[in-house]
């Protein structure tokens, strides 16, 4: 055929090299069959065309996978999906390996606390007493101060020097003087410890989160708390150790001398019973200061600790702010013998 020879010389060349039939021969036919008479070149060209067509279609369908088969037989996968070992032993190196089973988070080693404990705090130093102040007139002792120190905020508990701001014995009996001496600490992140002594010798007070100052409303934070400290006398010796052959057991009394002078304030830390009353969360009546009074804690018309302007009388009742018991053994009302105010972190 002239079509194949004129359009593609290369195909004609391949055809001539692949098939070279004898020009004098004709294809065999069965008896009785009608055989068309065609030339050998036309027969070879049509055979090559059919082989080329069917061969191309066969290669196309066998080389490219069917989209419908691949999507139906295989589940969808994410290229960046991560799967873990179901036994929890995946250490991060088996990411991308899909497994069957319930997902279990990878196992990590638990952190072990350091055997090294916190460093011990330095002993407190109470600074500010004048040389003329007698030892028995000092209210806050190192033993009581250490108990209060355990409850103040951490940023202040590491401070090992407390400074005396006001002392009734050194500065006189005046609440206005106390306010004046506190003005220099306005705007600073400091804390205050208030200590009071009643006429029976009881020591109690409060921790103040803010500077005491005259204000129309309550102020302060939940860091405030009330406290009281009482000296515990040692137990008397048993009767078997007392040589009293002629003394009857009924009505016996024993006087025990303390190991140290309690009036001087120098007592053993183990002989002090310290009790604190932290913030209860009921209300926010932490501090309220006026010209005629200073109070800490309130609720239902009662004050946890209240002092008058002359620092001569005080009141201590159960209040909702701290849920405390009365701080003075004298009752809700007591007389004042001493007042001290200490600053921490100045």
Curated annotation (Swiss-Prot):
TLDc domain residues: 138-345
Any one Gene Ontology BP term: response to oxidative stress
Broad class of the protein's primary localization: mitochondrion
GO CC terms of this entry: mitochondrion; nucleus
Biased composition (Polar residues): 1-19, 64-76
Membership in a protein family: Belongs to the OXR1 family.
Comp. bias intervals (Low complexity): 20-31
Record's function text: May be involved in protection from oxidative damage.
Source organism (scientific name): Podospora anserina
Top-rank taxon, per record: Eukaryota
Chain positions covered by the region annotation Disordered: 1-42, 64-108
Cross-referenced InterPro entries: TLDc_dom (IPR006571)
Cellular localization per UniProt: Mitochondrion
Protein name in the entry: Oxidation resistance protein 1
Keywords, comma-separated and alphabetical: Mitochondrion
UniProt keyword annotation of Mitochondrion present: yes
């Amino acid at each position: 055929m002239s079509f194949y020879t004129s359009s593609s010389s290369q195909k004609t060349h391949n055809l001539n090299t692949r098939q070279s039939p004898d020009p004098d021969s004709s294809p065999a036919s069965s008896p009785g069959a009608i055989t068309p008479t065609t030339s050998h070149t036309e027969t070879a060209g049509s055979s090559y065309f059919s082989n080329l067509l069917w061969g191309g279609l066969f290669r196309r369908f066998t080389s490219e996978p069917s989209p419908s088969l691949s999507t139906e037989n295989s589940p969808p996968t994410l290229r960046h999906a991560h799967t873990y070992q179901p036994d929890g032993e995946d250490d991060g190196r088996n990411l991308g390996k899909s497994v069957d089973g319930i997902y279990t988070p990878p196992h990590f080693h638990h952190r072990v606390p350091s055997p090294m404990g916190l460093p011990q705090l330095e002993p407190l130093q109470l600074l500010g007493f004048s040389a003329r102040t007698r030892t028995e007139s000092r209210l806050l002792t190192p033993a009581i101060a250490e108990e209060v120190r355990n409850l103040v905020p951490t940023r202040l508990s590491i401070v090992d020097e407390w400074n005396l701001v006001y002392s009734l014995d050194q500065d006189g009996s005046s609440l206005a003087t106390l306010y004046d001496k506190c003005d220099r600490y306005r705007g600073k992140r400091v804390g205050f410890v208030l200590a009071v002594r009643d006429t029976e010798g009881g020591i109690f007070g409060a921790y103040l989160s803010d500077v005491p100052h005259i204000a129309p409303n309550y102020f302060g934070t939940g860091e405030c708390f009330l406290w009281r400290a009482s000296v515990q006398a040692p137990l008397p010796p048993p009767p078997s150790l007392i040589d009293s052959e002629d003394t009857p057991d009924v009505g016996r009394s024993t006087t025990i001398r303390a190991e140290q002078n309690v009036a001087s304030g120098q007592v053993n830390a183990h002989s002090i019973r310290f009790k604190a009353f932290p913030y209860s969360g009921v209300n926010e009546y932490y501090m309220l200061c006026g010209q005629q009074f200073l109070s800490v804690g309130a609720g239902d018309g009662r004050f946890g600790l209240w002092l008058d302007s002359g620092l001569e009388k005080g009141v201590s009742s159960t209040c909702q702010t701290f849920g405390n018991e009365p701080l003075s053994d004298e009752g809700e009302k007591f007389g004042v013998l001493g007042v001290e105010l200490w600053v921490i972190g100045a």
